[in-house]
Amino acid sequence: MRVLLRCDGGGPLGVGHVIRSLALAEAAVDAGHEVVVAGHFEGSFLQGQLAAAPVEVAQLSAWAADGDLQPLIDLVRRLRPDVLHVDSYLAPDRLRVLVTSTGGGAGLGDEDPTSLVVSNMEDGTFGRRPADVVVDPTFGAELSARPADGTPWLLRGSRYTPVRQRVIDARRRASDDRASDHRASDHRASDDRGPDDNVGGVGQVARSVLVVMGGTDPVGLAPGAVELLARTGLALEVTAIAVGENAERVRAAAQGSRLSLNVLAPVDDLAAMMSAHDLVISAAGTSIWELCCIGVPTAVAWAVDNQREGYERVVAAGAAIGLCGPELGRYELGGDERAVDRLKRALTDPEVRARLVRAGRQIVDGLGAWRVVRTWEQALAVPSPPEIGFDPMVARPATPEDSRQLWQWRNDPVTRAGSRSSAEVSWDDHLRWFTASLTRTDRVLLVVEDPAGPAGTVRWDLVRERDGEPGGSHEWEVSITVAPERRGQNLGRPLLRAGEVALAEKTSGVTRSGGTEVHAYLAVVRIDNQSSMRLFETSAYLPDLPPDPGGFMRFRKDARVT
């Protein structure tokens, strides 16, 4: 698969569009694909990041005000990519139509566009446009309605946040409690503690703070952040990423305080630097999601309008300390005494920092780029998820009378070959399992029938929250068995659809009492079981977890995406 990534960065645009495009590039290259990154890139930091990436770089002019796509059209004609992914707020809304047009003019002319998958990155309403695949990594995006625009593949929510491999590596080195326990043990050995090092007996104060307002801090938030730190009255070692006039303002903000300040230009491995500090103050752009993924206590501000929604959601989720009050604008960090109090508490209470780490790691799990790239592969194989009409199938709850038939279906050799456990199940073991299943609140066991008789069984199991993984108590994993005598009749999708409908109906409205309302359907499939893989790929299930050592891969279908 050949992938063309279109993005711009540097100067007033910041670096976020390019950084997350590079995360996708790394994942695509790791999957064995060829990648070209095209765009207008300014500044030594971005140039260094691009030079170090395992991709070809095509330098273009920035998007023209009149939406001139000709440079991109020429590049598509020359490279003939399988996937064109665009991460830009400035591209024309009709990008997909213009790029894939076969009517001549600015389009591809005589080239066949039918195999080109157009993918688009959006942040809520910013950069929104129709495409074959739309990625909105905004935390909580899947909870809000999105206007229908004909996009067949929607990847919405923070599970699709692309982060670079160095961030994933930093996450793997960390644990949920490392931010407090490990660092606190290190600090106890320090000989230069001050009077505030054990405030109110809650534990030791954080020593080191990093201030990084994106790759370039285009609106100059760093001085206000340093001023807030100075007003806490704590003795802190502060590293601030700032250049030029902004760096001078940062130094001025620290004068007369207990801060020991070090001002640096943007660094190549920001993930390593973030991991080395007790707390980071960040803008609510790309960096905040990297911090969540790694597990670093964070205080956050919003720098530009497209960051405000993410800022509000990450603060509400308890994954970051908010420094912008509802009455404050994006540039006004220095004037809110409540922000100083919140910041001081986070710096002096290790349990506050530990809670931030735990909440953040559940928002971003580091697999977003893999999920996007795997969906591109799926979109090429399945141009769009087929519409599933009403099927003459009814799923009903299993009854004791169904026990023997389900046992026989389970022990069928073909069924066992595709199961996690391929051993035969004894009648006594099955009967105990079946009887218990009928009364469990975390399992829904269904028998699916049509006018011809029993067609199979669908079982749903509630997936409990896993350490370090997003999701949990509202996700249900499916297991499908087609009646052996009904194989070869293309019943997989009707069975699955009937099972989804029955589960949604059974759990609807029970959130208050049981907390089991469906948020997502899950499927775990052996990667060598091509029929099952195809079933879920053509039923709008998206790749969610890579194959485990046993060769089982997880798919996910969000019940809330609109």
Segments (PLM) and residue ranges:
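Conserved GNAT acetyl-CoA-binding A-motif
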Residues: 505-527
